[in-house]
Amino acid sequence: MSDYLIKALAYDGMARVYAAVTTETIKEAQRRHDTWSVSSAALGRTMTGTLFLGAMQKEDQKITVKIEGDGPIGPIVADSNAQGQIRGFVTNPHVHFSELNEAGKLDVRRGVGTSGMLSVVKDLGFGENFTGQTPIVSGEIGEDFTYYLATSEQVNSSVGVGVLVNPDDTIEAAGGFMLQLLPGATDEIIDEIEKNLTALPTVSRMIEAGETPESILAKLAGGEDKLQILEKIPVSFECNCSKERFGSAIISLGKDEIRSMIEEDHGAEAECHFCRNTYDFSEEELEKLYEEAK
């Protein structure tokens, strides 16, 4: 099944809800970055949470999330847009612990760390950026997105994200949900939401069992008939890097730096952090970039 995201309204229009299956997307991220179990879970959760923030944006806007904890994984970066395109990377892809956490799951909190910051940069187009930042409160990532939305954007939300990793480090299931209360929600509605959230199985297990974004939202809303589906968005790992972009980056280094690349290295190789694609620049190509540099 191809990955996709569903946007809907629930609870008589008093809650905005999103759910996504991201299994194939996170499989692609794992393949590109050769991530081990805990790094895979942390990267997959971050990418899925970022996907939801991207889905809240207008057509030409982009969102970048950076989670910088004090754990061995190091900074995690993901970006997404309103079209369901997502990419991400983790500083240390090779984190695996032989022990599970007290809940019998991969110890993502230990990998990410419990001290640090979650930063969100919204590229609003026209060269305008909005930046929000909140401390890491959990290291489990879903709770950290929830705290960010409540604190920085003043939206009471619940974010659940999960990745099921096989013993051979391949990805079995990935996805998540996000629920946001809208103004006017009554105490009765809030009680019902809390009851349904408590009864919800873990996201990765639901997806492993074959649940779809629609069926996850039906569980969250207390029935299919209580959902008003607004939009279905295909989701995929997409990177917009190119040799031209890296060429521009090399030009920005200045003539001295480019000259040393030519004379000492006789060329250059650039690698994209997000997708691991590499771009080779010959001496001749560097000479052309040298002429364009200041």
From Swiss-Prot:
The keyword Disulfide bond applies. One of its GO terms (biological process) is protein refolding. It comes from the Bacteria. It comes from Listeria welshimeri serovar 6b (strain ATCC 35897 / DSM 20650 / CCUG 15529 / CIP 8149 / NCTC 11857 / SLCC 5334 / V8). This is 33 kDa chaperonin. HAMAP family: HslO. Under oxidizing conditions two disulfide bonds are formed involving the reactive cysteines. Under reducing conditions zinc is bound to the reactive cysteines and the protein is inactive. Keywords: Chaperone, Cytoplasm, Disulfide bond, Redox-active center, Zinc. One of its GO terms (molecular function) is protein folding chaperone. It is found in: Cytoplasm. Redox regulated molecular chaperone. Protects both thermally unfolding and oxidatively damaged proteins from irreversible aggregation. Plays an important role in the bacterial defense system toward oxidative stress. Disulfide bonds join 239-241, 272-275.
